[in-house]
Every structure is written in structure tokens, then in C-alpha cells.
Amino acid sequence: MKTLRSTLLLLLFVPLIKPAPPAPQESPLTFDYAADHLEEAIFSQDYEDKYLDGKNIEEKQTMVRSVKRSLELQKDESVTPAPPKKENDEMPTCLLCVCLSGSVYCEEVDIDAVPPLPKESAYLYARFNKIKKLTAKDFADMPNLRRLDFTGNLIEDIEDGTFSKLALLEELSLAENQLLKLPVLPPKLTLFNAKYNKIKSRGIKANTFKKLNNLSFLYLDHNALESVPPNLPESLRVIHLQFNNITSITDDTFCKANDTRYIRDRIEEIRLEGNPIALGKHPNSFICLKRLPIGTYF
């Protein structure tokens, strides 16, 4: 009975009981990293822009000052007169030739005369052109020449004294031209080449080679010589006389007939092939030589 009464009272008061409102909870503290980073980036960019703007302005100002200074210098230079040129500074224009470090190359350019060249020239190569004559004026102002090469031209005449002022000339090539005679040669020649011309024995004077004490190489092959040139210097090492019209050789041509002990030891090569002569008929002509000439002996 008591239990039933308690149950009824509980049912009567339950509707009157209201649940208490939930206690307000504080929201947890959050950190918006993106927003904060964005603000920092904006600040940094703004600062950097201002810094760079200032730097660019400074650079532009510096550049303007440099340009002004350059213009002032140019103005001063234009007012200042240039020093007069010296005569030694002026050099002839090589025109069709190529001038390089004392060497002048005028090969296969169809010139018919020796062009004006720098005074300092030491080597002139004028091969395979149309030059017909050489004169003393061609080399009057070129005292330093050491080598001249006129191979393959049309040279018929060489004026007297053409090479007289070329005291330093060591090598001279007149090969493959139309020469009938030889000019007076400079004293210091070591090489002379006049092969493939039309030179006859009467076109070579008796003393042409006598005083050339430095001459080592002599090329006179493929000409019209009837005899070996006289008075060949002791300095000769190579003598080319092949394919001429040489018909006779004497005991004095290369040796000394009156001196059987004489030996010509410097000569290394003598070529006489292609001549109408039997070398075997002249045994005493080569007795002073270490090597017999190249040619037909029988």
C-alpha cells in the first residue's frame, strides 16, 4: 500500500521537473595561420616594394649622372684636336694583296706590275700573275726584302740594277717565266731559281755567280743552256741543270784540272739528265766530287 502511494506521488511531480539548461561552454581558442601569414606577406611585399622603388630610383639617378659625364667627355674630345699623323705611321694599302707581319701575298690576282708595298716588307710572294717586267723602281723603297718569288709570271726583261739595293735578299725565284738572260744578282743570295725559262748560255755573264759566296741552291733546269755556267761558287750544295742542251763538260767545270788533290766536298747533288751528253766520256770532270752527277753516262 505504501509502495503504491509513493509511485503515484512520483508520477504527479515528474511533469513539473524541468531539466536544467546546459552550462555554456567556452569555444576553444583557434589560430588562423593562413590569414595571419597573408597579412604578414602583404606587409612584407609592401615594404619590399617601397625598398626596391627607392633602390631603382637611386640606380636611375646614377645612370643619368654617368650618361651626362660621358657626354661631357665626348664634347671635350671633340674640341681637343687630334695629334698630327707621322709619315712613318702611313702604310700603302695592299689592295689586291694580303699584308701580314712583314709578308706580302699577291698570288693569282692578275697583277701586271709590282704594286706599292709597305717599306717593312721582308717577303713578297707574287706567283702566277701577269707581270712582264721588273724595274729598279719596284724595290727602291724596300731595303728589308729577304725573299722574292715571281714564279709563274710572264717576265721577259729585268732592268739593270733592279736588285742592286736589296743587300739582304737571300732567296730569289724567277721560275716559269720567259727570261732569255739573267740579271746581276744580289751578293747575299743563298737560293736562286730560274728553271723553266728560255735562258741560253750567252744570256749568263761569266761572273754572274762568281761572287755569290753564300749561294747554296742553284736551279737552272729546263732551259736552253749549251754549257754549264762558269765560275760556280764553292758554296754550292745543289745544282740542277737537267733538261737543257748541254753538250760538253771540261775538267774545270766542277773541279780544278791543275789540282788533283782538290775536293769539292760541299756539293751534294748535281743533276744533268735530259742533256745530249754522255757523262762517261768525261771521267776527269767529276774526280773532285764525292758523288757522281745524275745523268746518262753511256
Curated annotation (Swiss-Prot):
Pfam families associated with the record: LRR_8 (PF13855)
Where in the cell? Answer: Secreted, Extracellular space, Extracellular matrix
Question: Per the UniProt entry, what are the Gene Ontology biological process annotations, in alphabetical order?
Answer: articular cartilage development; bone development
What start and end residues bound the annotated signal peptide? Answer: 1-19
Provide GO CC annotations from the record. Answer: extracellular matrix; extracellular space
Q: Which Gene3D superfamilies has this protein been placed in? A: Ribonuclease Inhibitor
Family recorded in the similarity comment: Belongs to the small leucine-rich proteoglycan (SLRP) family. SLRP class III subfamily.
- Tell me what this protein is called: Mimecan
